[in-house]
Amino acid sequence: MTDYQTIETQKEDDGVLVITLTRPDVMNAFSARMMHEMIEALDQADADDTVRAIIVTGAGERAFCAGADLSEGDKTFDYAKRQGEAAKPSAVNDDGSINWDSEILRDTGGILALRIFNSIKPVIGAVNGAAVGVGATMLLPMDVRIASDNARFGFVFARRGIVPEACSSWFLPRIVGISQALQWCY
């Protein structure tokens, strides 16, 4: 398959594609590049009739994914300030109306979550270590989630002063119920 920088893909003989997040030095922190690479890997898997299922896991034992890579500070959530990326077009149309289909209105975790949800192959999350923020929410649209004995999950959005992302406010209550989802998120 394709040569990636933030993930590795391994197609097993039994038709299982393993996608491994490969940034263990930063606890597999999620970046825009990782989102694009995961979407490309999912697209290729869906197009390959020999792939029967997809497993997503993280390299190393400390974390499946420790959340968004915040190493760029305020540039993390500002498309116009990101280095090495073209600024995304505005979501405001010439007449002042909002283009609600604009990708700029969707967080990167949400784009990935919807792509996982729309996968035509079963997607399994194999969690080893911490799954925090987008690391936890990317698991929600997966068909099966398997946790190792050292897996830990954190929905830390409210404690960070941000809203839950990656469609988690839609997926989480459907998995664990509204009461448990509210307790975990707030």
Report each predicted region and the residues it spans.
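Hydrophobic/aromatic residues within transmembrane alpha-helices
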Residues: I19, V56, D69, M138-L139
